[in-house]
């Protein structure tokens, strides 16, 4: 059986499209829990009226009494999900009709801890702005992959038992975890297989108010200091995964993967802090350890404050 959980905050503009896409799934969820985090627009009214209009007896709307933030609201939702398989949903997205059926099938066939699919990117008008190339095949992903390329929460489905143990062990409070998809996505391989279904299953909306992604994150609009702060957080995050992994007695392969990820991130931090080209040379020898080549280029851009140059090149040649 399936639970779908979704956090909302001032999502009135797009929430009805997402509710429709969940309600009309070919494999209907057995439980939908929506937790609103003190919205000041019409989000709550729209959801309440929607549930009443469609007589959705298995849907529940909860309102936080105080603003908990995105992370704590999703942690709360994970604890409230009742069924064996749990899907996370974002308020602005649209699911394709076979999303729940496709991910449940892979989860059951592979006995995985977590499965995830791929997403179109759409703009505020619902127009597709990016369509990733996909194979349609299922691929197992290891810890090394997920430390660098964890899926976004809206793409995922988990076994409830995995979420329950993470919550009961209070891994939610470990340093570096501030997004539910980072927490659950990085820890899932410590509990079993993680499988990517390389198939487009939803449409993720990009707009100015997004929590997960905005135009600035794609355009070198941050600073060297913000990059340093981010890498320090990543190091804390990897240290937390390492400590949890040691508790769970994982394989030597996973230990080596964690060590490589920590070594690379520490080297990146040294480079940004010192601006010493010597460290850049060291990073070039480890470039395959980066998530993408763009991350290496971004380190160079932020270290030497080349943001303006990078933006002009992006504008001229495209992404």
Which residue stretches match the model-derived regions?
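Short aromatic/hydrophobic "clamp" motif used to bind/position activated sugar donors
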Residues: 86
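Conserved donor NDP-sugar-binding/catalytic core segment of glycosyltransferases
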Residues: 100-129
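Conserved nucleotide-sugar donor-binding catalytic segment
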Residues: 139-218
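Glycine-rich, basic loop-to-helix element that forms the pyrophosphate-binding segment
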Residues: 64-81
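Short, well-formed alpha-helical segments that are part of the catalytic scaffolds
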Residues: 11-25, 30
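A conserved acidic beta->alpha catalytic loop
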Residues: 36-45, 66
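C-terminal subregions of glycosyltransferases and related glycan-biosynthesis enzymes
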Residues: 172, 177-178, 203-319
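Acidic helix N-cap motif at the loop->helix transition within catalytic regions
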Residues: 16, 41-50, 72, 98
């Amino acid at each position: 059986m399936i639970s779908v959980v979704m956090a909302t905050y001032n999502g009135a503009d797009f929430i009805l499209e997402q509710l429709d896409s969940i309600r009309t799934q070919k494999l209907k969820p057995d439980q939908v829990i929506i937790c609103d985090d003190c919205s000041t627009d019409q989000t709550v009214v729209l959801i309440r009226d929607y549930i009443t209009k469609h007589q959705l007896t298995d849907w529940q709307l909860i309102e936080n009494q105080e603003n908990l933030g995105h992370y704590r609201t999703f942690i709360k939702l994970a604890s409230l999900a009742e069924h064996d398989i749990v899907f996370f949903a974002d308020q602005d997205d649209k699911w394709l009709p076979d999303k729940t059926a496709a991910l449940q099938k892979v989860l059951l066939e592979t006995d995985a801890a977590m499965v995830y699919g791929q997403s179109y990117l759409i703009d505020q008008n619902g127009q597709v702005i990016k369509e990733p190339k996909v194979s349609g095949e299922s691929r197992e992903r290891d810890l090394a992959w997920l430390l660098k390329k964890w899926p976004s929460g809206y793409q995922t489905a988990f076994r409830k038992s995995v979420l329950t143990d993470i919550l009961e062990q209070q891994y939610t409070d470990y340093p570096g975890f501030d997004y539910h998809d980072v927490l659950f996505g990085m820890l899932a391989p410590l509990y079993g297989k993680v499988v990517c279904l390389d198939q487009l299953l939803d449409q993720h909306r990009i707009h100015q108010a997004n929590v997960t992604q905005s135009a600035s994150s794609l355009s070198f609009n941050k600073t060297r200091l913000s990059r340093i702060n981010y890498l320090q957080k990543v190091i804390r995050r990897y240290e937390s995964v390492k400590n949890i992994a040691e508790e769970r007695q994982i394989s030597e392969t996973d230990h080596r993967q964690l060590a490589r990820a920590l070594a690379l991130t520490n080297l990146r931090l040294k480079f940004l802090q010192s601006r010493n080209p010597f460290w850049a040379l060291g990073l070039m020898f480890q470039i395959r350890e980066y998530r993408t080549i763009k991350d290496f280029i971004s380190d160079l851009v932020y270290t030497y404050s080349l943001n303006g140059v990078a933006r002009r090149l992006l504008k001229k040649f495209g992404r």
